[in-house]
Amino acid sequence: MTWSDILAEEKQKPYFKQILDFLACESAKGKVIFPTKENIFNAFKYTELDNLKVVILGQDPYHNYNQAHGLAFSVQKGVDIPPSLQNIYKELARSIPEFKTPNHGYLVDWAKQGVFLLNTTLTVEAHKANSHKDIGWETFTDTVINKISENKHNVVFMLWGSHARKKKVLIDSSRHLILESTHPSPLSAHRGFLGCNHFVDCNKYLIEKKDQKIDWNLLC
C-alpha cells in the first residue's frame, strides 16, 4: 500500500469532495488559505509510507504568512522559529548532548528520514487558528493514522497535548510504540514535555526493532 492508494480511495468519498469544494469556495471569496494549494499534502510527499518510522501529530497549520508549508511544527526558511518548535529543540538539546540547535525551523530533513509530520487538519484561513477544524480533514487524517497502524509495524507515535492524545484509540499499541506528553507550547511544555525523553526513547525503540534511528541533528 502507498499514499497514492490511500489518497485515491479517500478522494472518491463524499466528505473529501466536500473539503475540496469548501476550499474552492473560500478561495473564490478572496479568502487566503494556508498552506498554499501545492503544499497541502507535503507531509505525504516528503515521507513515503514505506520509509515511515515516526509519526508526530500537530493540530492545524500555522496561520500567518510564509509559515505553513504542509509539515506539522515546521516553518519555511527565513521565518522566526515558532515557540512550540523552540521547545522541541530545547528538549532535543537537553536529552541529546550532541544536538546542535538550528537557526531555522525547516524540518524537511526529518521528514525525508521517515518522520511523518502530520497536522490533523491540513488547512487554515489566514490569521484564524482552527478555522478549518470542522470541514472534514480529521475524517481523512484519522483514516491515515489508522492505515499506518494497520499496515506498518514498529512505528513510533508521538502524541503531544490532549488533541493528539485522543488519536491513541486509532493506534494498535501491540504493534507500535506510543509516546505521550503535554504539548510543547509555552503554555504546557513545562508540565511534562520538557524532560519527556521522547526523542531518545524513539531511537532506542527503532534501534531495537529495526536497527535504524533518526538523526535529529540532520537539519541542513
UniProtKB/Swiss-Prot annotation:
Location relative to the cell: Cytoplasm
Keyword Acetylation annotated: no
Recorded family membership: Belongs to the uracil-DNA glycosylase (UDG) superfamily. UNG family.
Described purpose of this protein according to its UniProt entry: Excises uracil residues from the DNA which can arise as a result of misincorporation of dUMP residues by DNA polymerase or due to deamination of cytosine.
Catalytic activities: Hydrolyzes single-stranded DNA or mismatched double-stranded DNA and polynucleotides, releasing free uracil
SUPFAM superfamilies (UniProt xref): Uracil-DNA glycosylase-like
EC number, UniProt record: 3.2.2.27
Active site: D60
Pfam families per the UniProt record, alphabetical: UDG
Protein name: Uracil-DNA glycosylase
GO BP of this protein: base-excision repair, AP site formation via deaminated base removal
Name of the gene this protein is made from: ung
Gene source species: Francisella tularensis subsp. tularensis (strain SCHU S4 / Schu 4)
Molecular functions (GO terms): uracil DNA N-glycosylase activity
Top-level EC class as recorded in UniProt: hydrolase
One GO CC annotation: cytoplasm
Protein keywords: Cytoplasm, DNA damage, DNA repair, Hydrolase
